[in-house]
Amino acid sequence: MEEVQPIKNVEKIALMKTILSQGDFGERNVLLFSIGINTAYRISDLLSLKLRDVLEIYRQKVRVKSRLKMTEQKTEKNNSVILTKKLQKDIWDFVSKEHAEWIAQQDLDHYLFASRKTNGGEQPLSRQQGWYIISNAGKKAGLQHLGTHSMRKTFGYHLYKNGVGLELIQLLLNHSSPRITLRYIGIEQEDKDQAVSSLGL
């Protein structure tokens, strides 16, 4: 399988959201993408999310949590990530419409991203479905090397571009060294050249 890349252009991220919003499952697909690029959770962890992971009952009312907490399936490490106000709103807009009955019953033991293709019972979206959703939208946006892992890489890349220290990004991504993180988030020669050319000593 080819190596996927982060989405480095902010306008392309906006275009991805526009493309993902189309169709019967548009709101679900946009939320999957939005949580992915804002938390760095791997696709297996995203798809395993249940309503109880993002919602809580407070004073007999359901509300969105301020952070996500889970044990990563791959590393078995605990991971706690804050949810931005915008992401909290996006989650609430989705669940209050898509899962209105469960919200009314305060029944939070259901998958956030449930598949519609199951024969009885409830299952989350599969990793293959997740891959198709993201990679297909990427092709429509003119992004050829895109997959579900691109969301995690996009998170790291834009933190780096926004001036967040490499050591902190390494910690957020659970990497063993800064060098691995640099390669992972797609810092290439052009980025290094730009950094040096701006020095002007």
Predicted regions, residues:
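Short, basic (Lys/Arg/His-rich) helix/loop patches that form interaction surfaces
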Residues: 22-25, 131-171
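DNA/chromatin major-groove-contacting recognition/catalytic segments
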Residues: 15, 186-201
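Conserved tyrosine-mediated DNA breakage-rejoining catalytic core shared by Y-recombinases
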Residues: 48-85
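Alpha-helix N-cap/helix-start motif at helix boundaries, enriched for small hydrophobics
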Residues: 32, 44-49, 169
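Short, leucine-enriched amphipathic alpha-helices that occur as contiguous helical runs
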Residues: 13, 29-30, 127, 131, ...
